[in-house]
Amino acid sequence: MKILVAVKRVIDYNVQIRVKEDGTGVVTDNVKMSTNPPDDNAIEEAVKIKEAGKATEVVAITVGEEKAQETVRKALAVGADRGIHVKVDGILEPLAVSKILQKIVDKEKPDLVFMGKQAIDDDCNQTGQMLSALLNLSLIHISEPTRPY
């Protein structure tokens, strides 16, 4: 069984954010970035399932600027087998990200797709639901880990 896990690069949760002077967003220059914490949880659960012998491969995917590859590297460091980085410049809306993920899912053909419950940078909780609709697949929304695997 192959598990694909989407991971997002966000401003680290310990950073006190500052709004740009023109009010168009938050300052990200020289700000510590990290993997979205709920996505860390998704990677961790996927790796645990693989370690229990219930999955054969965990693939981490991120969509974002060049530096977003750091999130894939972190996923590899904790046990993902492969990583995919779709490089895009600028900020994408959740539907655009969902459409990119749809193409990856169509190509990779995973048995499961894990995503964190929401991103801490926007709290929208839209990408997973949109991806589910685009793929015409069922969605298990905000599940709790079950033990044992």
Residue ranges and their predicted role:
Residues 71-96:
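A glycine-rich helix N-cap at a beta->alpha junction
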Residues 1-63:
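N-terminal beta-strand-loop-alpha-helix module at the start
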Residues 16-22, 70-77:
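Short, flexible, mixed-charge acidic loops at enzyme active sites
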Residues 105-110:
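Glycine-rich phosphate-binding loop signature in dinucleotide/nucleotide-binding domains
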